[in-house]
């Protein structure tokens, strides 16, 4: 399979690259070129990972076509995320723009760019949201901007599940609970999550490889704890 993963330099994204690249071609994007090179160097099959160190919100068509040289993409994982832990009254426009650009607009844009490649093979788009971005879940002080951005991504998924039916593309959302990553440490510094990044990556891979045949437009809560 050909797989595209955004936000793949750390945490769950990095674990997805390590696992999926053993038997598949993985295309990754992140701004952190040092981490991308380190991941590639330590892979069992380094040639199965082709990355671009670029801001996902500024990716051009020419850059994408150079980076992803194949005609079809089986799975797109919109995993890129950024968190600012700040009291609501102190959030400014720069905070808003950075979080929304990465957590929402980046996923929006790369999905637009890959529709044709995904349509070739009845592709599967999986948007990585958060328990904080869905209804009827606990919300936490300082995370209003992050949760709102993930809520926007969740609604986008539902819209695209309908709009992309004509392309035979399935779109689903995984709303993740607490996973032990750097981002969790930023949100909850003293908290120890019950799920590791590798464990969550294994679940995501299993979901992506099978669920597009029977699911579309679904929001799946994947959580042992929140946080």
Locate each region found by the language model.
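C-terminal helical subdomain
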Residues: 173, 189-227
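Conserved NAD(P)H cofactor-binding loop of Rossmann-fold oxidoreductase domains
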Residues: 79-85
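Catalytic loop of short-chain dehydrogenase/reductase
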Residues: 124-152, 157-158, 162-165
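Conserved Rossmann-fold SDR core element
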Residues: 154, 163-179, 214-220
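Conserved glycine-rich cofactor-binding loop
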Residues: 9-10
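Conserved glycine-rich Rossmann-like NAD(P)H-binding loop of the short-chain dehydrogenase/reductase
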Residues: 23-38
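Substrate-binding pocket helix/loop in short-chain dehydrogenase/reductase
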Residues: 87-88, 95-97
């Amino acid at each position: 399979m050909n797989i595209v993963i955004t936000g793949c330099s750390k945490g769950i994204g990095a674990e997805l690259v390590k696992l999926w690249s053993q038997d598949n071609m993985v295309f990754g994007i992140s701004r952190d070129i040092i981490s991308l090179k380190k991941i590639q160097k330590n892979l069992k099959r380094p040639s199965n990972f082709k990355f671009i160190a670029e801001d996902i919100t500024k990716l051009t068509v020419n850059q994408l076509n150079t980076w992803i040289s194949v005609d079809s993409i089986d799975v797109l994982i919109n995993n890129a995320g950024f968190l600012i832990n700040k009291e609501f009254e102190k959030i400014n426009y720069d905070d808003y723009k950075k979080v929304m650009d990465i957590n929402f607009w980046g996923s929006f844009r790369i999905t637009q760019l890959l529709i044709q490649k995904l349509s070739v093979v009845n592709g599967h788009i999986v948007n990585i949201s958060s328990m904080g971005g869905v209804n009827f879940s606990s919300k936490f002080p300082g995370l209003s901007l992050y949760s709102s951005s993930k809520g926007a991504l969740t609604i986008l998924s539902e819209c695209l599940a309908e709009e992309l039916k004509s392309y035979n593309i399935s779109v689903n959302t995984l709303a993740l609970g607490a996973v032990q990553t750097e981002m969790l440490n930023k949100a909850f510094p003293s908290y120890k999550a019950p799920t590791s990044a590798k464990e969550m990556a294994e679940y995501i891979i299993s979901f992506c490889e099978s669920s597009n045949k029977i699911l579309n437009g679904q929001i799946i809560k994947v959580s042992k704890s929140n946080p």
